[in-house]
């Protein structure tokens, strides 16, 4: 990724709920783009970007969110590393599409739970 330090600085200005929303949005974009083999490089870039977003978010997240995000980051790293070889196969694209959609939805759920907990003072 180009200008990663500038992206990180800007990203870290957002609160946790915004960052989790950004991770969920990126995963939704991966889900949407992964079905088209012509978009494989864009998907690979989004996978890498989401790995960074998670790396920068984990230190500020509650333990349950940290655990979830680290597991997601491991899977993202595997998809990212292997995507050039995997993307031509429609089955692999479908697996990534489904996985990233489910993880996006789970991230949004965690975001809502985290916001509800922090706003209630718990």
Residue ranges and their predicted role:
Residues 1-122:
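Surface-exposed peri-terminal alpha-helical interaction modules
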């Amino acid at each position: 990724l180009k200008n990663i330090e500038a992206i990180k600085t800007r990203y870290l200005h957002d609160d946790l709920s915004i960052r989790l929303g950004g991770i969920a949005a990126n995963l939704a974009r991966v889900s949407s783009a992964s079905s088209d083999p012509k978009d494989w490089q864009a998907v690979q870039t989004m996978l890498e970007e989401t790995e960074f977003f998670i790396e920068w978010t984990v230190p500020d997240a509650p333990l349950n969110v940290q655990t979830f995000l680290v597991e997601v980051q491991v899977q993202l790293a595997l998809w990212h590393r292997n995507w050039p070889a995997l993307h031509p196969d429609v089955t692999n694209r479908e697996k990534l599409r489904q996985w990233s959609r489910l993880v996006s939805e789970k991230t949004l759920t965690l975001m809502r739970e985290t916001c509800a907990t922090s706003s209630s003072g718990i």
